[in-house]
């Protein structure tokens, strides 16, 4: 018998099923926004029913989602809330637009309203963050802006009050409703994959660096976590395959539509897409063929005619169609455009055959605007019949095509073009009448010129048959070298051609290798830019982690306020004497150097934000690893990282330099402005707290006094929170220190709990000592005089 499924698992499964249904509805909304409004009017009853269901779901789930936001968010709950909000808002807007269209009948006005063409860009959200060091203003425009802001908020969590963080996170959530809540597909204007995310950084930290710095590797990183690529496969015969099975059509209509579709596909299928010879080359070949046809064996063969025959031989035997590098990487953008035209023609033909009208979808209603876009925008928008991978291949082939259009590379990659040029030059000389009447074997004035033209056109650039015959011709009788000035000139010209060929061959190899390396490096960016992107789980997970950290602080203060016994030292009389006594007792001692590594890790644990929690994983890492991820992801300057790393070691617990706070002014930032100075002041306060508690444990021998964070506790399956005894740093300047000296056996705060509030390190330690004194072996030390 299978084990029963736990209640949280069942709830998660239900939320996943609900999430899938809401995503389907959002996808329908996105389709109807771009579809002919006449079709949308026919779907009004179903659309209204879905809108009513979304209203009911939102009304029923919203209280629970809001309660969970104050308790513990999950990426699933965040995504579901964003989708519900977007589905409710955009579904109502679509219904209103369809009803307006039913009255006005203006297709352009319908698309202007549904697509937001008359409204400002919705992806600009101003965010204000109030910190102890001042107010920070930012603007969110991309998905990576959201991730960067959340990482920055995570780093500055110790100087940010929970109220200010909650207000800023609410503005971030509003941006994510339109950005992430719009379904699976990411709008191209929202994605900027050149900015690496925290997952990119973590992946690079665990892979071989090949001697490169992390900054250099991040600069070349294409993020595929905030948005992920989706493989899109398009079937060219999809309409032909599924039309026979379309529901709601009569057999006669279906047969007529299939007949029209076949006729339209046959008419638009013309053209093979292969390159055709230019008219100029065609006329040259015709002229050469006419001269050769007029010659027979009874006539003397002139050197020019022999050169024409040899060039025609190389042209006939050198057909490299579909084999050369040029053909392998030729641009195929026209073929993609032809495919789009064929798809559009077939769709319109079927629409006319079935419905008697051409549907006015968004791309057709605004076709003139889309046609005015440049090539880059058109590629980003894409098409209905071409997949992004087809566009990428066409772009890469276009790059090679453009690179190979230089005269040198064109002659090397396409030797037949050299033969065409040589044939044209020979015909030009013969047209001048210089060599047409000279007998074969004679020493006419164009003999050397024709031979050189043939060699340049065939063997000069590496065609078969070159090399050996040339070498023999250069030498005189007996192979002893040239004997006349003509032989010297011929040999010099041949040497120049050979050096030119070798240099061009080497240049071509380097050029093509460099181009190939560039294409390989840029292909990832092209794929990320042009392929369809879907939302990843990074943003919901990051938002949930940061929001949970600040919600835990507010929840901790609310729960401790309801404890059975609450001692508030912030306004109690006689606290100053306790402060002075404990301060004097601790300043006489210094921290054991052997404890410095452990208290340094404690410092890192308290400074680190709630986002990077590697120290709590199943395979836990030390706190310095999580802090490393935190500071590196915000680009902290090297001198600040060095200062942070040596903050505890620099003090060492000796002298009184570590005690920086005045009485009842612990975690007070009055008179301090700026993020970095405020951060440094918070580091000093945290160092003071750590050293004071360490000395307190060693002086009074009461065991280790635990320093904890409010977000150390997670809810149980019953929704309860356990807070073990210890001193908690709340990061709240009004009440920065809370000591739980007694709690219920299960660790929950209740009537038996004893809680101490304070704004002073030494007075709260004295209160802890008072509660620990009856349990100490020697009964504790004397109190303040």
Swiss-Prot record:
Positions annotated as zinc finger (C3H1-type): 197-225
Keywords annotated in UniProt: ATP-binding, Host nucleus, Late protein, Metal-binding, Nucleotide-binding, Viral genome packaging, Viral release from host cell, Zinc, Zinc-finger
Region span, Disordered: 433-489
Residue positions binding ATP: 696-703
Record-level GO cellular component terms: host cell nucleus
Listed GO MF terms: ATP binding; zinc ion binding
GO biological process: viral DNA genome packaging
Residues that span the membrane, as ranges: none
Location(s), subcellular: Host nucleus
A Pfam cross-reference name: PRTP
Self-association state and partner proteins as the record states: Associates with TRM2 and TRM3 to form the tripartite terminase complex. Interacts with portal protein.
Functional note: Component of the molecular motor that translocates viral genomic DNA in empty capsid during DNA packaging. Forms a tripartite terminase complex together with TRM2 and TRM3 in the host cytoplasm. Once the complex reaches the host nucleus, it interacts with the capsid portal vertex. This portal forms a ring in which genomic DNA is translocated into the capsid. TRM1 carries an endonuclease activity that plays an important role for the cleavage of concatemeric viral DNA into unit length genomes.
Family, as annotated: Belongs to the herpesviridae TRM1 protein family.
Protein name, as recorded: Tripartite terminase subunit 1
Native source organism of the sequence: Human herpesvirus 1 (strain Angelotti) (HHV-1)
């Amino acid at each position: 018998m299978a084990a029963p499924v736990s209640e949280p698992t069942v709830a998660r499964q239900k939320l996943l099923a609900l999430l899938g249904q809401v995503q389907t509805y959002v996808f329908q909304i996105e389709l109807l926004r771009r579809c002919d409004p006449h079709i949308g009017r026919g779907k009004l009853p179903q659309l209204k029913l879905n809108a009513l269901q979304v209203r009911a779901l939102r009304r029923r789930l919203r209280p629970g989602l809001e309660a969970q936001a104050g308790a513990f968010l999950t990426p699933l709950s965040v995504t579901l809330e964003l989708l519900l909000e977007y589905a409710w808002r955009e579904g109502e807007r679509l219904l209103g637009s369809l009803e307006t269209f039913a009255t006005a009948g203006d297709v352009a006005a319908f698309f202007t309203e549904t697509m937001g063409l008359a409204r400002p860009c919705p992806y600009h959200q101003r965010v204000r963050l109030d910190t102890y060091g001042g107010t920070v203003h930012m603007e969110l425009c991309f998905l990576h802006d959201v991730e960067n802001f959340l990482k920055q908020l995570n780093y500055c969590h110790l100087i940010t009050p929970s109220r200010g963080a909650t207000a800023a996170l609410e503005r971030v959530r509003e941006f994510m409703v339109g950005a992430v809540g719009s379904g699976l597909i990411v709008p191209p204007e929202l994605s900027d994959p050149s900015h690496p995310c925290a997952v990119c950084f973590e992946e690079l930290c665990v892979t071989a660096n090949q001697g490169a710095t992390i900054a250099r590797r991040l600069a070349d990183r294409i993020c595929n976590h905030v948005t992920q690529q989706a493989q899109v496969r398009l079937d060219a015969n999809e309409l032909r395959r599924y039309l026979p099975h379309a529901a709601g059509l009569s057999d006669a209509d279906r047969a007529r539509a299939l007949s029209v579709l076949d006729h339209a596909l046959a008419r638009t299928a013309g053209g093979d897409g292969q390159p055709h010879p230019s008219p100029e080359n065609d006329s040259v070949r015709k002229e050469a063929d006419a001269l050769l046809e007029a010659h027979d064996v009874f006539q003397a063969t002139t050197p020019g005619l022999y050169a024409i025959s040899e060039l025609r031989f190389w042209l006939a035997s050198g057909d490299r169609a579909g084999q050369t590098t040029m053909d392998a990487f030729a641009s195929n953008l026209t073929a993609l455009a032809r495919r789009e035209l064929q798809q559009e023609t077939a769709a319109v033909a079927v629409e006319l055959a079935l419905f008697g009208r051409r549907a006015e979808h968004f791309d057709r209603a605004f076709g003139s605007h889309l046609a005015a876009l440049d090539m880059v925008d058109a590629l980003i928008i894409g098409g209905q019949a071409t997949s992004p991978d087809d566009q990428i291949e066409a772009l890469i082939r276009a790059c090679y095509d453009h690179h190979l259009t230089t005269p040198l590379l064109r002659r090397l990659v396409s030797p037949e073009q050299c033969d065409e040029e040589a044939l044209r030059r020979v015909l030009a000389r013969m047209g001048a009448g210089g060599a047409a009447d000279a007998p074969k074997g004679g020493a006419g004035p164009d003999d050397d010129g024709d031979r050189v033209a043939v060699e340049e056109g065939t063997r000069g650039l590496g065609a078969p048959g070159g090399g050996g015959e040339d070498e023999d011709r250069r030498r005189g009788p007996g192979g002893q070298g040239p004997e006349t000035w003509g032989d010297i000139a011929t040999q010099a010209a041949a040497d120049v051609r050979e050096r030119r060929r070798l240099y061009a061959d080497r240049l071509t190899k380097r050029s093509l290798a460099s181009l190939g390396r560039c294409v390989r490096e840029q292909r990832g960016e092209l794929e990320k830019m042009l392929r369809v992107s879907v939302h990843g789980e990074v943003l919901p997970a990051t938002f949930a982690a940061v929001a949970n950290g600040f919600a835990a602080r507010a929840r901790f203060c609310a729960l401790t306020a309801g404890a059975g016994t609450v001692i508030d030292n912030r306004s109690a009389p006689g606290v100053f004497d306790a402060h002075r006594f404990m301060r004097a007792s601790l300043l006489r001692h210094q921290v054991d150097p052997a404890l410095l590594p452990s208290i340094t890790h404690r410092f890192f644990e308290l400074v680190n934000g709630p986002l990077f929690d590697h120290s709590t994983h199943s395979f836990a890492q030390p706190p310095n690893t999580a802090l490393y991820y935190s500071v590196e992801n915000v680009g902290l300057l090297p001198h600040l990282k060095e200062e942070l790393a040596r903050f505890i070691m620099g003090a060492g617990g000796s002298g009184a330099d570590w005690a920086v706070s005045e009485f009842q002014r612990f975690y007070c930032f009055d008179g301090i402005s700026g993020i970095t100075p405020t951060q440094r002041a918070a580091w000093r306060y945290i160092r003071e707290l750590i050293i004071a508690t360490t000395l307190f444990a060693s002086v009074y021998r009461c065991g280790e006094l635990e320093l904890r964070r409010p977000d150390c506790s997670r809810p149980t399956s019953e929704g309860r929170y356990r807070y073990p005894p210890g001193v908690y740093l709340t990061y709240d300047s009004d009440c920065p220190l809370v000591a739980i000296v007694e709690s219920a056996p299960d660790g929950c705060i209740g009537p038996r709990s004893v809680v101490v509030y304070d704004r002073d390190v030494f007075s709260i330690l004295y209160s802890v000592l008072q509660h620990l004194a009856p349990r100490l072996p020697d009964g504790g030390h004397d109190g303040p005089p």
